[in-house]
A protein has these predicted regions:
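Class I (Rossmann-like) S-adenosyl-L-methionine-dependent methyltransferase catalytic domain
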Residues: 1-89, 107-114, 118, 122-177
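Hydrophobic adenine-recognition pocket in adenosine-nucleotide-binding enzymes
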Residues: 103
Length: 177
């Protein structure tokens, strides 16, 4: 799609998720009877690779972008839906693992907190988020110049405190510019 949708040149690249999926499988003990939700799934690339690596696994994805879902990978499109991370359309404890990669920091702080609470609510205890973070002023300046979509901009220590404040108990990692 073109840049006005934010997905210009956003195409499937096997090198991104295929090397990571076996680590997910081992860390969370994923198998054909597992269920995984991707919050901020975009076009479903990670879920495609997950389903290809673990046949039979239940995958679901949500994204706020109708454009992304409409242009998702055919192999997983039926398992994706437009939804807001602040109000996930699933019952409590619906998924073995809930993953959200570089998504929640794009929400304002209060909304980000609600999204993290929703991730916690629909998981059966295992979750993983990545967020942009910084450790010093130089990294903060780089992040401000580079990530134009992030609305919750915190240091590593501030993120840890924020996770605790909102009750998010899953795993987490940072992208540091």
């Amino acid at each position: 799609g073109d840049r006005r949708h934010g997905y210009g040149g956003f195409n499937y690249q096997p090198r991104f998720w295929q090397p990571v999926i076996p680590t997910f499988e081992k860390h969370w003990g994923l198998s054909a009877i597992s269920s995984v939700l991707d919050v901020g799934c975009a076009k479903g690339f990670m879920l495609h690779d997950l389903a290809a690596h673990i046949p039979g696994i239940t995958v679901r994805g949500v994204d706020v972008s109708a454009y992304a879902i409409a242009h998702a990978m055919e192999s997983v499109q039926a398992h994706l839906q437009v939804a807001d991370a602040q109000s996930l359309p699933f019952a409590d404890r619906s998924f073995d693992v809930v993953i959200s990669i570089n998504t929640v920091h794009n929400l304002e702080r209060e909304a980000c907190g609600r999204a993290l609470q929703e991730i916690q609510r629909v998981s059966r205890g295992q979750a993983f988020v990545t967020v942009d973070a910084y450790r010093n002023e130089r990294e903060r300046e780089r992040m401000m110049a580079w990530n134009l979509t992030a609305k919750t901009i915190l240091s590593v220590d501030e993120w840890v405190q924020f996770f605790e404040e909102v009750g998010y108990r899953g795993d987490y990692f940072w992208f540091i510019p």
